[in-house]
Amino acid sequence: MARIAGINIPPQKHAEIGLTAIYGIGRTTAQKICDSCGIARDKKIKDLTDGDLEKIREEVGRMTIEGDLRRETTINIKRLMDLGCYRGFRHRRGLPMRGQRTRTNARTRKGPRKSAAALKK
């Protein structure tokens, strides 16, 4: 089993798909990594040589991924909340911040509905 950036990559998957198991790497980035390393996108992870895996590790090592990316995202959201700007306020209240309607919908951000009886107490 290949291990890249502390993540076990599923060996039966294609290189392009397997790389998306790493937080911060999607399909497009995975394609760019495969192309820059000279690896066929449809080659299975288990068929990659140690040299290929080392090239991928080197390429992935230059990117902000996993814990660092999560930390950076959290810091950015905290900065918005500390600034007191509109987006920070919406984050703090748990509401959508990109202009979506909230009278109906927005259930993902707002969570499950609260019954009228629960609000009266």
Swiss-Prot record:
Keywords: Ribonucleoprotein, Ribosomal protein, RNA-binding, rRNA-binding, tRNA-binding
Keyword Ribosomal protein recorded: yes
Pfam families in the cross-refs: Ribosomal_S13 (PF00416)
SUPFAM superfamilies referenced in this protein's UniProt entry, alphabetically: S13-like H2TH domain
GO BP of this protein: translation
Taxonomy, superkingdom: Bacteria
Subunit structure: Part of the 30S ribosomal subunit. Forms a loose heterodimer with protein S19. Forms two bridges to the 50S subunit in the 70S ribosome.
Family classification: Belongs to the universal ribosomal protein uS13 family.
Primary role: Located at the top of the head of the 30S subunit, it contacts several helices of the 16S rRNA. In the 70S ribosome it contacts the 23S rRNA (bridge B1a) and protein L5 of the 50S subunit (bridge B1b), connecting the 2 subunits; these bridges are implicated in subunit movement. Contacts the tRNAs in the A and P-sites.
Name this polypeptide is given: Small ribosomal subunit protein uS13
Natural source organism: Methylibium petroleiphilum (strain ATCC BAA-1232 / LMG 22953 / PM1)
